[in-house]
Structure formats: structure tokens, C-alpha cells
Amino acid sequence: MVNELSFNCEDAWLNLFVGGEMYPVQVKTLMNPTTCGSYFRDVVKVSDAAIKVRGVQWDTAPNHIKFRVDIDRDGVLFRHVLQYLRNGKLTSLPDDIFTLESLVAEAEFFGLEKYREMLKKKLWKLTGKRQYYACYEDSD
């Protein structure tokens, strides 16, 4: 059963169940204004009274977190997405072209425009392909 749950603290934890992989994450990570994409802005709603998370289910995972949100995406790739949500610009990017291209699709799904630009910039540097050039604006 999918429902909405209210938290009174942004330090609360959720399990994100992505493509068969479990990712424990604090609600405040999903709310980070510098990295939060449109997907998580839709899932996490902040008001004066509470923080509401849509799509929460009771979790029977063997950790201390009792609530989870299911996301039908690639669970292995999501570890890179979560690293970006936690670290922003300091995120390390893989050097594998296939993984980078796959992450571009994940960034688009989650509405992470800055992450998408970082990935395309790295792809442009690795491949020199013009299709990635449009996002490359600075000189570093």
C-alpha cells in the first residue's frame, strides 16, 4: 500500500529501494537544495508543520529503518546518483563511457540538471564528441 508519511525531523531515515538495492538515506539528503532534483522535490514536501514523504511503505528490512520508498530504476547506477545527492560538485565520476551515458539517463529521470551537465562534460572530455559539447561552457 502506497501512502504518505509525515516526519517532524529532517534527520529521519528512509530506505530507498532502487532496482533491488537498498539505500539508507536521511530525509535531509533528499531535501538538499543544491542537489535535489525534481523527482525528490515531488516525493518530499516540506511545510511548517512537518516533512511529508510520498510513496512510503512499511519496511521489513533487517536494519533500524522502518520506512521505504520504492523506485523502479537501476539499483547499481543509483549509488552514483546518491553520491551526487550527498556530495554535489565533489562527486567522483566514473571513467567508463557506457556508465556515464547510463548515468545521464538516470540524471534526466531524477531531474538532476547540474549532475547531468557534469556527466556530459566528462563525456565530452573523454570522447570529444560534439553531442556532449553543448553543456561544456567553462574552461576547466
Curated annotation (Swiss-Prot):
It comes from the Eukaryota. GO terms for biological process: protein homooligomerization. InterPro entries: SKP1/BTB/POZ_sf, T1-type_BTB. This is Uncharacterized protein F47D12.3. It comes from Caenorhabditis elegans. The lineage of its organism: Eukaryota, Metazoa, Ecdysozoa, Nematoda, Chromadorea.
